[in-house]
Amino acid sequence: MSVISMKQLLEAGVHFGHQTRRWNPKMKRYIFTERNGIYIIDLQKTVKKVEEAYNFTKNLAAEGGKILFVGTKKQAQDSVKEEAVRSGMYYVNQRWLGGTLTNFETIQKRIKRLKDIEKMQENGTFEVLPKKEVVQLKKELERLEKFLGGIKDMKDLPDALFIIDPRKERIAVAEARKLNIPIIGIVDTNCDPDEIDVVIPANDDAIRAVKLLTSKMADAILEAKQGEEEAEAAEETAPETETTTA
């Protein structure tokens, strides 16, 4: 059984690309036709590429790999957060801070600051500080949480990125490529597929399309984790083999 059906893709509007004047010729192989000035994506190819992305993600997660979900455009923000949280992975859904990957040590210092302020809030320090200082700390905490909340538990560089709209997230793409971190991406007709390791040709502007495809990547991670749990349970319940001596 395939990971995703043509019906699901059609209903979510995955096949609608960009206007023909806003296209990248490298996406030609994923285009089925043109209709009313808009490119229509070949969903047969999308089905196959979703399957490829699903298996890649599942295998990576099965080996303990960590995946960073990235989508800062309005249509992607909610799905990216929800599906990353659901699958126990990390996310960036606001602004990508330059150096998130390539200057990871500096980002870790900002995350430490975020956690320090959280501790101050939890252990009662806020109650003994001047009101003005507390207001400033709360503002700082809110800002740090907004931009770093989705990666505050990410202790090492991720093993892969899942990106919605590589054109919009070009800084994230450039950083990942510099560090040889593989990228899975939802790639519309105006993007460059050569920058992405596992291309999912799809509409990256429709909320339903983004939600559907992002949820499939989360499903792949959860399937891998479930497989691990079942294997561990089987090991625990397996009867010990007795050895007999002649």
Swiss-Prot record:
Question: Where on the tree of life does the source sit, at the highest rank?
Answer: Bacteria
Quote a single Gene Ontology cellular component term. Answer: cytosolic small ribosomal subunit
What Gene Ontology biological process does one annotation of this record name?
translation
Q: Where is the composition biased (Acidic residues)?
A: 229-239
Q: What InterPro entries does UniProt report for this protein, alphabetically?
A: Ribosomal_uS2, Ribosomal_uS2_bac/mit/plastid, Ribosomal_uS2_CS, Ribosomal_uS2_flav_dom_sf
Assigned keywords, A-Z: Ribonucleoprotein, Ribosomal protein
Please name the Pfam families in this protein's record.
Answer: Ribosomal_S2
Q: Which family does it belong to?
A: Belongs to the universal ribosomal protein uS2 family.
Can you say what this protein is called?
Small ribosomal subunit protein uS2
